[in-house]
From Swiss-Prot:
The species this protein was found in: Rickettsia rickettsii
Family: Belongs to the chaperonin (HSP60) family.
GO CC annotations, alphabetized: cytoplasm
The protein's name in its UniProt record: Chaperonin GroEL
UniProt-listed Pfam families: Cpn60_TCP1
Matches recorded under InterPro entries: Cpn60/GroEL (IPR001844), Cpn60/GroEL/TCP-1 (IPR002423), GroEL-like_apical_dom_sf (IPR027409), GROEL-like_equatorial_sf (IPR027413), TCP-1-like_intermed_sf (IPR027410)
Subcellular location: Cytoplasm
Gene name, Swiss-Prot/TrEMBL: groEL
Subunit structure: Forms a cylinder of 14 subunits composed of two heptameric rings stacked back-to-back. Interacts with the co-chaperonin GroES.
Length: 408
């Protein structure tokens, strides 16, 4: 069993404060729009340049156990600020250090620590109320850009790109940040629903130059289980062939004989078809397939409700204006779902977001909400070197989190 180092009283507090000071001094230089960058050595690859307080805090581990305990205590304040607001981590660190320092002085002077804690709670509540009174709603695109600019260390381009992305997909839309393969910084907007599953066979590709399968005005079959035999599907396949429209199959998986038969039909030109795996896992996969069904005005074929493939009619299939499938992603554009049904589904997901206590579940529900209600915007961050790209990407992520918090 590992031995424990036990210390009491003022000496222990002083050593913990030394650890708090070491971490706070490293973090505080990044404070505000005029804050400076910090260079962090990494165990592999190039050094990391960042102006993000929590990134600096997370990189610090002290050899002395008591000092390190103080540093970790302060680190938890920065981490919590990052989780809740996504930004303001340096401010949280500086304030937490001040509370610890001044609190220690009063404890040393004989004040009751619990009375001090109660006083701090009262002060926090009073300050929060005053901040709420002086706050203002962020509505216009110009104001959104200003928040992003300030949070990104005065980079106007970052602020403007975030504002543009929010305008395109809405304040609740999915906005992701990726590294670009060139020098530019662009906003790429995908209208409709995108999920991270690509075609199950490259033989489904219709555009060999772009290596994508493009289906115009397709029917969409949603099946909850695996497809390994197409025999039960023959009636619906014949109906689709007669309609002379393409077919997209979304199922848990399409394998073996079923996949081979679809590929052969595709190559012979008898049926314009593509198959993809359903997004997500378990209950979340079923919920996402139900989302797609509502978006495309189709039905999720599930055996739990006694539905069988051989009994499916063409009326049970969803439809969309266009579907584009790459090796990694599927995009359903302009689904023909009923607007009222989509709005009801959006309200249902919002209700689930309000009720859940899990951060992970909340994030996944918000992704589903955005896919249904808006679209997907990708901020592609480029630069001359890997270090520059990563530093700018960090600032974009910080600015995006701050802007999201501002428009809530």
């Amino acid at each position: 069993m590992a031995t424990k180092l036990i210390k009491h009283g003022s000496k222990a507090r002083e050593q913990m404060l030394e650890g708090i000071d070491i971490l706070a001094d490293a973090v505080k230089v990044t404070l505000g729009p005029k804050g400076r960058n910090v260079l962090i050595e990494q165990s592999f690859g190039s050094p990391k340049i960042t102006k993000d307080g929590v990134t600096v805090a997370k990189s610090i581990e002290l050899k002395d156990k008591i000092r390190n305990a103080g540093a970790q205590l302060l680190k938890s304040a920065a981490t919590k600020a990052a989780e809740v607001a996504g930004d303001g981590t340096t401010t949280a660190t500086v304030l937490a250090r001040a509370l610890a320092r001044e609190g220690n002085k009063l404890v040393a002077a004989g004040y009751n620590p619990m009375d001090l804690k109660r006083g701090m709670d009262l002060a926090v509540n009073a300050v929060v109320e005053e901040i709420k009174k002086s706050s203002k709603k962020i509505n216009s695109q110009e104001e959104i850009a200003q928040v992003g600019t300030i949070s990104s260390n005065g980079d106007k381009e970052i602020g403007e790109k975030i504002a543009k992305a929010m305008e395109e997909v809405g304040k609740e839309g999915v906005i992701t940040v990726e590294e670009a393969k060139n020098f530019s910084f662009d906003v790429e907007v995908v209208k409709g629903m995108m999920f991270d599953r690509g075609y199950l066979s490259p033989y489904f590709v219709t555009n060999s130059e772009k290596m994508v399968a493009e289906l115009e005005n397709p029917f969409i079959l949603l099946f909850e289980k695996k497809l390994s035999n197409l025999q039960p599907m023959l009636p619906i396949l014949e109906a689709v062939v007669q309609s002379q429209r393409p077919l997209l199959i979304i199922a848990e998986d399409v394998e073996g004989e079923a996949l081979a038969t679809l590929v052969v039909n595709r190559l012979r030109g008898g049926l314009k078809v593509a198959a993809v795996k359903a997004p997500g896992f378990g209950d979340r996969r079923k919920a996402m397939m139900e989302d797609i069904a509502i978006l495309t005005k189709g039905e999720l074929i599930t055996e739990d409700l006694g539905m069988k493939l051989e009994n499916v009619s063409i009326k049970s299939l969803g439809t969309a204006k266009r579907v584009t499938i790459s090796k990694e992603n599927t995009v359903i554009v302009d689904g023909n779902g009923d607007k009222k049904n989509i709005e009801d589904r959006v309200l249902q997901i919002k209700s689930q977001i309000a009720e859940t206590t899990s951060d992970y579940d909340k994030e996944k529900l918000q992704e589903r909400l955005a896919k249904l209600s808006g679209g997907v915007a990708v901020l592609k961050v480029g630069g001359a070197t890997e270090v520059e790209v990563k530093e700018r990407k960090d600032r974009v992520e910080d600015a995006l989190a701050a802007t999201r918090a501002a428009v809530e």
